[in-house]
Amino acid sequence: MMNTPVSGLVPFPAPQEAALHPQAVQVRADQPADPRAMLGAFEQLLGEFALDGYAAGAGVESAEVAEPIALVVGTSGSTGTPKRTALTARALAASAAATENFFDSNSNAASQWLLALPAHYIAGAQVLARSVLAGTAPVIARSVTEPVHFSPEVFLQAVERMSSARRFISLVPTQLHKLLESADANPSLGAEIHEALGSFTGILLG
């Protein structure tokens, strides 16, 4: 159980402290967060939505009353006034359900995610939340937890560690461009990259 924010309180005025769930995960863009610690917090926050039913959208309808905030992602404010994005556990579950339903297949395999984005970014945090909701352990690329850059080698190493046939990854355009550019420059490596990319049930890009 985690009773304190993962990366310290985001020093912005909103959302108000009273609206935060006791286990709320709070991160900001200029402070890297520990994805494993975040997983532990999400397990507490998302327990009622996990596993059975969430992929079909069960239990994630809009609530009529205000719910505690589960995730707060703050910007660094480098281009202006710092802002905060706040999501409830129900909102995280609804997002995960939408992804599952969009990539619906006949596979009985559980969904497994590869985390290739920083956990303190909203897309990275959502990968962790979706993993908890799916009841599977995400594979975390070395570039997320170690002082190495995302590269084709790091990507391929992470893909090799995946165990489910139903697999997902979230990337930003520059990451995908790097993979495809490397594939074009090195045919031997390119075959591995294309095979790895083709093994994913879904690739979220944004």
Where are each of the predicted segments found?
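A conserved hydrophobic position in a structured secondary element of the catalytic/binding core
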Residues: 87, 123, 171
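Conserved AMP-binding A3 loop
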Residues: 68-97, 104
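Conserved S/T- and glycine-rich ATP-binding loop of Class I adenylate-forming
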Residues: 75-78, 113, 128, 169, ...
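Short beta->alpha connector loops at strand-helix junctions that form conserved
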Residues: 117, 142-143
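Conserved ATP-dependent adenylate/AMP-binding module captured primarily in the ANL superfamily
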Residues: 2-49, 93-114, 148-165
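Conserved AMP-binding loop of ANL adenylate-forming enzymes
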Residues: 104-136
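Adenylate-forming
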Residues: 144-206
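Conserved pre-ATP/AMP-binding loop-to-beta segment of ANL
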Residues: 54-73, 106-111
